[in-house]
Amino acid sequence: MGAKLTHRGLRTIATIAIILGLITFWVLRPIRETDFATPGFTPLKDDLLAAKFAPVVLGHELYGAPTRLLYRMARNTKGEVFIAYHPFYPAEENPHKGFGAFMNRIIYTGGLHLKDIMFGPADIELIEVVLDKDGKPTLMAYEDAEKYNPSAFSVRHLAKSVNNPRQPFCFTTPAWNHMFALADASRCAGKVALKAEYFSEPEWVQYRMVKKTEAILRRNRMHRVYERIGAN
């Protein structure tokens, strides 16, 4: 009887090990390799230019406000300048009631901290401004929340862009995961943008912005291809 139990126990352990191995393989298997080449772009660092076009992001009483504004910049062969601003939040959490919001707190942003495992620490978003060769803004791109439901587990991202945007670039924070909604300039009257700081290579690595190989639980963070090589 003892031998049968022992064999049964070994089979159970072996079965569990195989299942865990398959799950691990599925989770960690490579999805895609990241191409770190940035053909046609020359990285730049210009704090004054970055400050000139820095967006103003208004905080939310429940969702908080960015504490830093990081940036990377590049020029293409046409002379256009691309500025990727990264509003930086120390953390993100859905404070609302509801089963989905609760599960998010114990699985994604807290508890198991899947967000940190998948992407990296803190919450780093993206607002892009493109200038023509004469320094005039021709495009602004960002992500808003689509059909926002604060009680849901997740927030759907909706990419938006504005041609020939006019300053000041004023945004509100409509969702707990720090998406952006373009607001009337009057909302930002008297407000000053955060100091634009160059996104240094040590911090770029620290916050795991780009992964060499993406997997189910290892994903690149929001960025543009031209940011993958920093300015010296």
Task: Place the predicted regions along the sequence by residue.
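N-terminal Sec-pathway targeting helices
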Residues: 2-19
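Hydrophobic alpha-helical membrane-insertion segments, chiefly the h-region
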Residues: 19-27
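A domain-level signal for the mature, folded cores of soluble proteins
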Residues: 27-125, 131-132, 136-232
